[in-house]
């Protein structure tokens, strides 16, 4: 079950090349012949992402949950990002099995669950990054003005995180509703079965993901940082504010790095949605290969964040070393 949006279409007799997520009902489910290098590379790449993601995000969860001094507002949001990434990497082996078997052997309940988790992966990262950007906006602006942010507490951050999960659940619910098993030419697949006219519903689902999963959160993030830069230019920092600004600069850098990596991984995926909606690309080996590359890039976001924490967060590195040394002792 792979989001290969470059050659998805809302019309009939459109194969998804082993990718069932997003295929409309009535589409041809016959497996496309994949080039041998691609047939080998895709499960290997997915397997590496799964292994690295599970190890890295497990380490992040372990450090953030076991170290009292790591219980900060920013780390609450980082913890939830790690939970979302860990959840996705836990089910990635099912995607690998689906790719290798070229059919869905896991039943309809699992089909709906995996589709939902896949969509959680699509929406949750940018939603939490939008919240983290809003938090950075408030903190940096308050620091520049030598004041505190009222109500910015660990408990409030947890409440906001729960609200984000609730919102993402509502957003991904339609995908779980439409997901079901469909069989054609002897192949059972987990697909999104849209009502008639299926072309309309398919396009609506792609626009839904593009707008709610990318355009709105990215626009919000850009607006926050643009407004922040404009306001900072108009403020003269006193010595106390400059000291606080230096102390918080590393956290802001970490959030900006996480955001940059997320956009790098997810922008091609959402741009490919625009291509799929506006063009009718032939299903050539090159197009299929590009589609799998874009999908793999979006999946890779789930395993990259722990490396950012390790390189950019001194507290995380120290806490991880201490916990590892304690367990060794």
UniProtKB/Swiss-Prot annotation:
What role is this protein assigned? Interacts specifically with a number of opioid ligands. Receptor for neuropeptides B and W, which may be involved in neuroendocrine system regulation, food intake and the organization of other signals.
* Alphabetical UniProt keywords: Cell membrane, Disulfide bond, G-protein coupled receptor, Glycoprotein, Membrane, Receptor, Transducer, Transmembrane, Transmembrane helix
Cite the CDD domains for this sequence. Answer: 7tmA_NPBWR
Q: Which organism is it from?
A: Mus musculus (Mouse)
Q: What is this protein called?
A: Neuropeptides B/W receptor type 1
- InterPro entries membership: GPCR_Rhodpsn, GPCR_Rhodpsn_7TM, Neuropept_B/W_rcpt
One GO CC term, this protein = plasma membrane
Q: Where in the cell is it found?
A: Cell membrane
Q: How does it sit in the membrane?
A: Multi-pass membrane protein
For side Extracellular, which residue ranges? 1-43, 97-112, 180-209, 272-289
């Amino acid at each position: 079950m792979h989001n290969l949006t470059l050659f998805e279409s809302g019309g009939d007799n459109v194969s998804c090349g082993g990718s069932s997520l997003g295929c409309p009902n009535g589409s041809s489910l016959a497996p496309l012949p994949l080039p041998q290098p691609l047939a080998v590379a895709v499960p290997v790449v997915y397997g590496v992402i799964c292994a690295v993601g599970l190890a890295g995000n497990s380490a992040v969860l372990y450090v953030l949950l076991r170290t009292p001094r790591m219980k900060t507002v920013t780390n609450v949001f980082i913890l939830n990002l790690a939970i979302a990434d860990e959840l996705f990497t836990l089910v990635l082996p099912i995607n690998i099995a689906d790719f290798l078997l070229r059919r869905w052997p896991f039943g309809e309940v699992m089909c709906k669950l995996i589709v939902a988790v896949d969509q959680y992966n699509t929406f949750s990262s940018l939603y939490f990054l939008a919240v983290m950007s809003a938090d950075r906006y408030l903190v940096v602006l308050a620091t520049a003005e030598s004041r505190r942010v009222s109500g910015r507490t660990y408990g409030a951050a947890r409440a906001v995180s729960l609200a984000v999960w609730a919102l993402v659940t509502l957003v991904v619910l339609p995908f779980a509703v439409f997901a079901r098993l469909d069989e054609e030419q002897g192949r059972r697949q987990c697909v999104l079965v849209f009502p008639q006219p299926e072309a309309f519903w398919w396009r609506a689902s792609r626009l839904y993901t593009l707008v709610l999963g990318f355009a709105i959160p990215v626009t919000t993030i850009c607006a926050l940082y643009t407004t922040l830069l404009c306001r900072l230019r108009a403020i003269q920092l006193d010595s106390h504010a400059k000291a606080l600004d230096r102390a918080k600069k590393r956290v802001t850098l970490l959030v900006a790095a996480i955001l940059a990596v997320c956009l790098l991984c997810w922008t091609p995926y959402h741009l490919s949605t625009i291509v799929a909606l506006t063009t009718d690309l032939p299903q050539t080996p090159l197009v299929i290969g590009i589609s799998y590359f874009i999908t793999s890039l979006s999946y890779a976001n789930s395993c990259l964040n722990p490396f950012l924490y390790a390189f950019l967060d001194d507290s995380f590195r120290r806490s991880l070393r201490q916990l590892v040394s304690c367990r060794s002792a």
